[in-house]
């Protein structure tokens, strides 16, 4: 009788972006790179595989590999054209040293817009028969990265982004959903509203069921 390990192995999520994919990006190239990453994990005996996050990379946004842009720019309520005055104000903010440009400006109520995480998830899910983990950037990080001219409150914006992400999560074909919050360790005093926004994503009763949840 084969028993499953109580503690399963996995990887953080993102993989180094291969040069050849950046030189010749296409839907098929993303699939090929993802297949290599997943197969490497399977060969190593990883229990819970993930896709390397290649579909989110953007060579035009090297500071964070286009990760933030991937999530916020398709959302409703976001403006992507940034004025010079907005750039100057953004660069003067504390905690934004890792970026020189905002990914977007919030000008209206945030919604899912054209964001389609289920498509990216399904594309990777088809490449493995192992348990699959899908990762996404969390509402705390996303809310703090944009310029907010609508909510005028980062916690309120984070809640709205959390709701938009929850709409996506309920449709994901993944065994585990991982929320990445890289900015939160540097802002521990924001934990209460950050936790509330993250819970908006992961505690959605609309279909999440018994799937695993991870916060990084």
Predicted regions and their residues:
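Domain-level signal for soluble alpha/beta catalytic cores
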Residues: 1-216
């Amino acid at each position: 009788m084969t028993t499953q390990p109580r503690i399963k192995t996995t990887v953080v999520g993102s993989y180094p972006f291969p040069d050849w994919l950046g030189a010749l990006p296409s839907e098929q190239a993303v699939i090929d790179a993802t297949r290599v990453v997943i197969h490497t994990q399977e060969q190593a005996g990883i229990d819970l595989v993930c896709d390397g996050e290649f579909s989110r990379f953007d060579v035009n946004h090297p500071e964070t590999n286009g990760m933030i842009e991937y999530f916020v720019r398709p959302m409703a309520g976001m403006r992507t054209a940034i004025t010079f005055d907005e750039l100057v104000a953004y660069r003067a903010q504390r905690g934004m040293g890792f970026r020189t440009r905002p990914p977007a400006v919030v000008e209206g109520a945030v919604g899912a817009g054209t964001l389609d995480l289920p498509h990216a998830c399904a594309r990777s899910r088809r490449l493995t028969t192992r348990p699959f983990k899908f990762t996404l950037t969390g509402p705390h990080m996303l809310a703090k990265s944009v310029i907010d001219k609508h909510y005028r409150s980062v916690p309120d914006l984070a809640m709205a982004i959390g709701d938009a992400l929850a709409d996506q999560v309920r449709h994901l074909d993944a065994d585990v959903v991982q929320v990445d919050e890289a900015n939160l360790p540097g802002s521990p005093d924001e934990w209460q509203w950050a936790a509330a926004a993250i819970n908006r994503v992961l505690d959605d009763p609309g279909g999440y069921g018994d799937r695993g949840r991870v916060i990084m």
